[in-house]
Amino acid sequence: MEKVLVFGHKNPDTDAICSAIAYAELKKELGMNAEPVRLGEISGETQFALNYFKVEGPRFVETVANEVDNVILVDHNERQQSANDIESVRVLEVIDHHRIANFETSDPIYYRCEPVGCTATILNKMYKENGVTIRKEVAGLMLSAIISDSLLFKSPTCTEQDVAAARELAEIAGVDADKYGLEMLKAGADLSGKTMEQLISLDAKEFQMGNAKVEIAQVNAVDTNDVLVHQAELEKVISAVVEEKGLDLFLFVVTDILTNDSVGLAIGKAANIVEKAYNVSLENNTATLKGVVSRKKQIVPVLTEAFQA
């Protein structure tokens, strides 16, 4: 049987990795030769979850057409966030919870996108719909994805469905969601030992906003100053990325997991759009974004609207 690769976006977060593992397992149970892979490095937060539940991480691939003809996307759909040669393969399915943009196919596909906080929440339903029992380890990874995407249920993207799914999965996994979740988030917020290049690419996504090319990277921290003390070095590597990719804006968002506020570092010719979007003034290229924790709900749509205004 021909193999199908299942993967999340570039610079994968916990949902991208864990949902690829969980959905590949469901597809295998349903008779497909599916393998989860990843398009980037595994973050400290994700590695904590993999280690905790004793699951091996997916292997890394840069291209997919050299291996398979068919793929399944989880936790993304936008072409620039996917495999470099995504146009050379057939996308069979998409399971996602983001906006739909820069995506089209030549054939009809199974496309499931729901306005929930995490892809794993959708997968929890799909396991039940197909009558497949979720293994303890996989339940733990799916729980980890929901905790990560919802910032332990504090993000405005978090829905009642996410909370209910997390409670169900925690029971299967045999953990206390709140206690385990805080441990996992703290592991993810430990940025010691990371280079500046790693910091700005840990969780970075590229977007087309009107005519503007924008990249938004986000890291969680227990104290934003632990990251911003390196601002001069950060600006240097961000400026290099802006030039290399021809970006109009690179927004580096440092989120405090204790206060649920963020600081944005904006570099590029369109940095003023951040001021316009949030009614703030950039001082030394930074501004505090009160109550902003979600790139999907509080940054991407707000900036997109500001660029198109």
Curated annotation (Swiss-Prot):
Cofactor: Mn(2+)
One Pfam family matching this protein: DHHA2
Cofactor, free-text remark: Binds 2 manganese ions per subunit.
Coiled coil: none
Reactions this protein catalyses: diphosphate + H2O = 2 phosphate + H(+)
Species assigned in the record: Bacillus cereus (strain ZK / E33L)
Keywords on record: Cytoplasm, Hydrolase, Manganese, Metal-binding
Residues holding Mn(2+) 2: 15, 75, 97, 149
Major enzyme class: hydrolase
Chief localization: cytoplasm
The keyword tRNA processing is annotated on this UniProt entry: no
One GO molecular-function entry: manganese ion binding
Name of this protein: Probable manganese-dependent inorganic pyrophosphatase
GO cellular component, one term: cytoplasm
